[in-house]
From Swiss-Prot:
Protein's gene: rpsS
GO molecular function: rRNA binding
Keyword match Cell membrane: no
Record GO cellular component, one term: ribosome
Keyword Cell inner membrane assigned: no
The protein's name: Small ribosomal subunit protein uS19
Length: 14
């Protein structure tokens, strides 16, 4: 899922 920008990048690279 894509919610934040840098916070999600650490969880998923998509």
């Amino acid at each position: 899922f894509r919610g934040h920008d840098k916070k999600d990048k650490k969880i998923q690279k998509k």
